Amino acid sequence: MSNFTAEDKAAITSLWGKVNVEDAGGETLGRLLVVYPWTQRFFDSFGSLSSPSAIMGNPKVKAHGVKVLTSLGEAIKNLDDLKGTFGSLSELHCDKLHVDPENFRLLGNVLVTVLAILHGKEFTPEVQASWQKMVAGVASALASRYH
């Protein structure tokens, strides 16, 4: 059963249709790595993450950010089954990568910040509430393997 109302779904999908995944993805992952530097430990293979400018200009950060937001796009298509949508990713992040599930919540909050920056007045409090609900649902689905 979904916790998303018809209004939530409309707010999420309407804004998502305007999101440039390449721009928002790189910005989101880059900001996560700058604001929460301990998350960098999962990205040793990305090369230099020595400064905010190195992180924000790193092509591997941008590419992985695109991958993350592309995955989020799949979630948006399956809001009624986030746990099922992220089952294999939850397993990967838990069993192989050993990512602290709190990082999923942090990433979601950074994404909401980026969307607010990129979409300005269109990112109303109501739209934000729907997106917060969605990123919390995604974080919970990604953390499901940990429980």
Curated annotation (Swiss-Prot):
Q: Does the keyword Metal-binding apply?
A: yes
Report keywords, A-Z.
Answer: Heme, Iron, Metal-binding, Oxygen transport, Transport
Q: Which residues form the Globin domain?
A: 3-147
Q: For this UniProt entry, which segments traverse the membrane? A: none
Domain of life of the organism encoding this protein: Eukaryota
A single GO BP term for this record reads: hydrogen peroxide catabolic process
The text of the family note is: Belongs to the globin family.
Q: Which PANTHER family match?
A: HEMOGLOBIN FAMILY MEMBER (PTHR11442), HEMOGLOBIN SUBUNIT GAMMA-1 (PTHR11442:SF52)
Summarizing the function annotation, the protein's role is: Gamma chains make up the fetal hemoglobin F, in combination with alpha chains.
Q: How does it assemble?
A: Heterotetramer of two alpha chains and two gamma chains in fetal hemoglobin (Hb F).
Question: Can you name this protein?
Answer: Hemoglobin subunit gamma
Recorded source organism is Alouatta belzebul
